Amino acid sequence: MERDLERGPPGPPRPPLGPPLSSSIGLALLLLLLALLFWLYIVLSNWTGGALLVLYSFALMLIIIILIIFIFRRDLLCPLGGLGLLLLMVTLLLIALWNLHGQALYLGIVLFIFGCLLVLGLWIYFLEILWRLGATIWQLLAFILAFFLAIILLIIALYLQQNWWTLLVDLLWLLLFMAILIWMYFHGPRHTDEHHHDDSLPHPQQATDDSSHESDSNSNEGRHHLLVSGAGDGPPLCSQNLGAPGGGPDNGPQDPDNTDDNGPQDPDNTDDNGNTDDNGPQDPDNTDDNGPHDPLPHNPSDSAGNDGGPPNLTEEVENKGGDRGPPSMTDGGGGDPHLPTLLLGTSGSGGDDDDPHGPVQLSYYD
């Protein structure tokens, strides 16, 4: 089974109503041919059988109709073929009533009335099926009028007992059932299922694209929402692409030994002017041995009130550790103005600056 690239893989297949076997079709065609021959012999012969001739001819026509339904629309055998079969049984009962007498005749009449009621009920049920399939009021009225007209003409044929009238009545019944078959072919379930398309369902390709976009957004969100924690006995773990030069200030909780002599940010702990590089970004010329990654000069009287502290490297700084500026958390990275916003802070409840054992959490958001 080929897949529809627009709708994706097909769902579980429905059990189809397979075509009849070739042997059964051949047998049905043979029976249909024999029924046509018998019907033509009865109608076109000079045999005068009276009302029984009309009933035999009508019974053969019903057999022909049932065989046609079996060959071309086997799925309609239950409603439409059942209607023809019930009409055939009522016709055979009426033929039997022609030779009955006494109590058997009365019982046969009761059965005949019961059979006629069954035919009427099955016809109403079939009209309801046509209504559910989309038949209009005018189409239903046309079928109802044709059905009752065929019954009235059959009664007239029983009264006239003429072969030519019987031929017309039988052809009218055949035309009625053929009209129903043709209508069912264009409006029945088999025809509508082939062109049915449910647009309420999401397109599989669209669902795949939505999921891919969602996964991309989740991955981007995961890249931009980082949390870096450090233990109390060592420097915090930080990304090398996010930080600023220099180490933490003296006496800061982020520097275990309170000095930056042995920090990874400055290999020789000196700058170009021979000054020690204990506090990193506070060099006079704002340069060190590691190159041009030092931040720009800062204003000692800025709004941060750090009195010579490190420059404000981020757009938003949350410092719960004290009045000193936040320590540098990376080694040698430059103060790129295009870096994401850093959010720095300690997890201590009281903001104790002298507690070196408090875990440090660092996160940033775009």
Swiss-Prot record:
GO terms for cellular component: host cell plasma membrane; membrane. InterPro entries: Herpes_LMP1. Residues 194-232 are annotated as: CTAR1. Residues 194-366 are annotated as: Disordered. GO terms for biological process: symbiont-mediated activation of host NF-kappaB cascade; symbiont-mediated suppression of host JAK-STAT cascade via inhibition of host TYK2 activity; symbiont-mediated suppression of host TRAF-mediated signal transduction; symbiont-mediated suppression of host type I interferon-mediated signaling pathway; symbiont-mediated transformation of host cell. Residues 332-366 are annotated as: CTAR2. Belongs to the herpesviridae LMP-1 family. Acts as a CD40 functional homolog to prevent apoptosis of infected B-lymphocytes and drive their proliferation. Functions as a constitutively active tumor necrosis factor receptor that induces the activation of several signaling pathways, including those of the NF-kappa-B family. LMP1 signaling leads to up-regulation of antiapoptotic proteins and provide growth signals in latently infected cells. Interacts with host UBE2I and subsequently affects the sumoylation state of several cellular proteins. This is Latent membrane protein 1. It comes from Epstein-Barr virus (strain GD1) (HHV-4). The gene is LMP1.
